[in-house]
């Protein structure tokens, strides 16, 4: 009995396998990028009077509560609307540095912000933030609204991240209660 040899062209095989490979790649990429480093804000209120002092915390967590090699962040602000008076309660574990810089590169793609707090933490053993637990506070900003405060937005952008994680920042809208 003769063997059956179907005639399938190479092009037909590729056309058949391409959607399967694409679907598999999309499914698997979801597993690879499923872990995230998340940086957000925590504050009691977002409504402020002109010339009012306030405090806002910058908070870190991972989606899987896992440890990482660290993170670098930027907290962008509009210096015509608020002044950052001091940066307090920094997470000491793995702290690399904290400084205020002019936002000439417009990292947050927001033309209204002109400065940012640049901060970073690192652990070469991939054990950051250590025994702090999650979520954990990275730092607190002590700030004051301008005398003519009309509202502004704070933005967090990610400068560097653990290679095993995707990362996301956040925005916080601060509104003026002048005239209320």
Segments (PLM) and residue ranges:
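N-terminal secretory signal peptides that target proteins for export/translocation
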Residues: 1-16
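Sec-dependent signal peptide recognition
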Residues: 17-23
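N-terminal signal peptide c-region/cleavage motif recognized by signal peptidases
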Residues: 29-31
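Acidic, low-complexity intrinsically disordered segments
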Residues: 33-180
């Amino acid at each position: 009995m003769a063997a059956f040899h179907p005639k399938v062209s190479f092009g037909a095989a590729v056309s058949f396998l391409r959607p399967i490979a694409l679907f598999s790649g999309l499914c698997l990429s979801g597993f690879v990028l499923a872990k995230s480093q998340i940086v957000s804000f925590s504050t009691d209120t977002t409504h402020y009077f002109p010339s009012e002092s306030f405090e806002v915390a910058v908070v870190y967590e991972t989606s899987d509560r896992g440890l990482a090699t660290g993170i670098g962040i930027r907290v962008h602000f509009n210096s015509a609307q608020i002044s950052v008076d001091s940066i307090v309660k920094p997470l000491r574990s793995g702290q690399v540095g904290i400084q205020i810089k002019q936002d000439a590169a417009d990292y947050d793609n927001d033309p209204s912000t002109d400065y940012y707090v640049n901060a970073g933490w690192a652990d070469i053993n991939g054990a950051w933030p250590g025994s702090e637990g999650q979520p954990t506070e990275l730092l607190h900003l002590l700030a004051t609204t301008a005398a003519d405060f009309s509202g502004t937005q704070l933005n967090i952008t990610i400068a560097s991240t653990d290679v095993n994680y995707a990362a996301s920042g956040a925005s916080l809208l601060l509104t003026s209660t002048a005239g209320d």
